[in-house]
Curated annotation (Swiss-Prot):
GO terms for cellular component: cell outer membrane. Consists of a soluble N-terminal domain and C-terminal probable beta-barrel in the outer membrane with 14 predicted beta-strands. Expression of just the C-terminal domain restores about 30% levels of TbpB lipoprotein and nearly 100% levels of fHbp lipoprotein on the cell surface in strains B16B6 and MC58, and confers surface expression of lipoproteins TbpB, LbpB and fHbp, but not HpuA in E.coli. It is found in: Cell outer membrane. Disulfide bonds: none annotated. The chain crosses the membrane at residues 204-214, 241-252, 257-267, 280-291, 294-304, 316-325, 330-340, 354-364, 368-377, 393-402, 407-417, 439-448, 455-464, 478-488. Residues 203-488 are annotated as: C-terminal probable beta barrel, partially restores export of lipoproteins. Interacts with the C-terminal domain of surface lipoprotein TbpB. This is Surface lipoprotein assembly modifier 1. TPR repeats lie at residues 118-151, 171-204. Present in outer membrane vesicle formulations which are used as vaccines in human. It comes from Neisseria meningitidis serogroup B (strain ATCC BAA-335 / MC58).
Length: 488
């Protein structure tokens, strides 16, 4: 016989547009000496351990299955007239995790008056999970578990769906229950992998890095040394040791909620120019919600900064964030931050800031991604309006892994404008408010063959340039460094 396989394309004549073309019907219809199937409504089909059978690779299923020279053409009406064949096909599709088969057979099976409600509910859950409707799948699985608590196959799917939807506490409970079941070794190994992943989600995450940088113009002195009768500071070059260390922990709550706490310290040390040493340390804590597609939260923070080894300022603030996967390849990242800075050296420099950032990331494949972003930053100083400005920025990044060579690169470009409320010292002579234009570029290169204890060094070259109608604020800065980062 010949049975066509249907997976979204029409291979049959127009008069048979609704024909079901599934190989699994062959065994259901023509199996020799097949014993009569018992009533599916009384069968404990959800107590099987075979729920995690690997899905059928649809690309390897032949379009036609030949046997005895016959051709079987079955449409929905024919199946409805043969409830036993329809039930066999539905059951076979479910236990083999044949998503394509479930998608075709389920709508017809639901029209059958003598249907197995549990089988239909299970199929609806599998299909919803495959289509990314995880909350709907969880609802179906929970209804099934309530009816049949001793169903490890369903519980495994429920636990996986909860894990996927970031309901970590509920997922951990289900996986703990599964661990007590007498499951096959392969499934028990899968349960342990999930439990390990859940522990890692809530474990402390520590990251750090350092680099040695050769910098040009570390004091950000103007490009000109003379302007009229004024003499500006000379540009200072130097070597810096940059460092960063941070730790963060997440505590999972019910229904996808979580709390976080963390701290970090970063800065740079100039061995030959200690007056330029700069360090920032901060702590933060917050609450958030995450599921399969989005992650949103609110965090409060406190930061302290030292400059030249002396206390310089501290900042208190809050940050909102919302990240969402729009599609499997497109992701949006949004955040808003407000903070109040207190300058411990000069009270007239106290200010508040507001920052809003939006990014769009496109993951072309596992080896390439593109990112574009828009930023707005506003700083206000009640005591000195000359420091007040708005900054409008654009960002672009391109990450690439170059084929099988092992070489990877990351290119970053940024441009921004600063509009000040009042003229600067030199722009005031022209009767103009201060206006700055910024340009930032950097290129990072690394090779996966070069690593030591899990650390792959990155070579980075960067250039920063500011052009201004106030000559004192025009400068260029170049850096070259090798960076070492580690997360554990």
């Amino acid at each position: 016989m010949v049975i066509f396989y249907f997976c979204g394309k029409t291979f049959m004549p127009a008069r048979n547009r609704w024909m079901l073309l599934l190989p699994l019907l062959a065994s259901a219809a023509y199996a020799e000496e097949t014993p009569r199937e018992p009533d599916l409504r009384s069968r404990p089909e959800f107590r099987l351990h075979e729920a995690e059978v690997k899905p059928i690779d649809r690309e390897k299923v032949p379009g036609q299955v030949r046997e005895k020279g016959k051709v079987l053409q079955i449409d929905g009406e024919t199946l409805l007239k043969n409830p036993e064949l329809l039930s066999r096909a539905m059951y076979s599709a479910v236990v083999s995790n044949n998503i394509a088969g479930i998608r075709v057979i389920l709508p017809i099976y639901l029209q059958q008056a003598q249907q197995d409600k549990m089988l239909a509910l299970y199929a609806q859950g599998i299909l919803a999970q495959a289509d990314g409707r995880v909350k709907e799948a969880i609802s179906h699985y929970r209804e099934l578990i309530a009816a049949q608590p001793d169903a490890p196959a369903v519980r495994m799917r429920l636990a996986a769906a909860l894990f996927e939807n970031r309901q970590n506490e509920a997922a951990a409970d289900q996986f703990d229950r599964l661990k007590a079941e007498n499951l096959p070794p392969q499934l028990m190994e899968q349960v342990e992998l999930y439990r390990k992943a859940l522990r890692e989600r809530d474990a402390w995450k520590v990251n750090g890095g350092f680099s040695v940088t050769r910098e040009h113009n570390i004091n950000q002195a103007p490009k000109r040394q003379q302007y009229g009768k004024w003499t500006f500071p000379k540009q200072v070059d130097g070597t810096a040791v940059n460092y960063r260390l941070g730790a963060e922990k997440k505590w999972s709550l019910k229904n996808g909620w979580y709390t976080t706490a963390g701290g970090d310290v970063s800065g740079r040390v100039y061995p030959g120019n200690k007056k330029f040493n700069d360090m920032t340390a901060g702590v933060s804590g917050g609450i958030g919600f995450a599921d399969r597609r989005k992650d949103a939260g609110l965090a409060v923070f406190h930061e302290r900064r030292t400059y030249g080894n002396d206390a310089y300022s501290y900042t208190n603030g809050a940050r909102l964030y919302f990240n969402r996967w729009q599609t499997p390849k497109w992701q949006t990242l949004s955040s808003a931050e407000w903070g109040r800075l207190k300058n411990t050296r000069r009270a007239r420099s106290d200010n508040t800031h507001l920052q809003i950032s939006n990014s769009l990331v496109f993951y072309r494949n596992a080896r390439q991604y593109w990112m574009g972003g828009l930023d707005f930053y506003r700083e206000r100083n009640p005591a000195d309006r000359g420091d007040n400005f708005n900054r409008y920025g654009l960002r672009f990044a391109w990450g690439q892994e170059w084929g099988g060579s092992g070489l990877s690169s990351l290119l970053r470009l940024g441009a921004a404008k600063r509009h000040y409320e009042k003229p600067g010292f030199f722009s005031g002579f022209k009767g103009e408010r201060r206006r700055d234009k910024e340009l930032n570029t950097s290129l990072s290169l690394w090779h996966r063959a070069l690593h030591f204890k899990g650390i792959t060094p990155r070579l980075t070259l960067s250039h920063r340039e500011t052009r201004s109608n106030d000559v004192f604020n025009e400068y260029e800065k170049n850096r070259a460094f090798v960076e070492f980062n580690k997360t554990f």
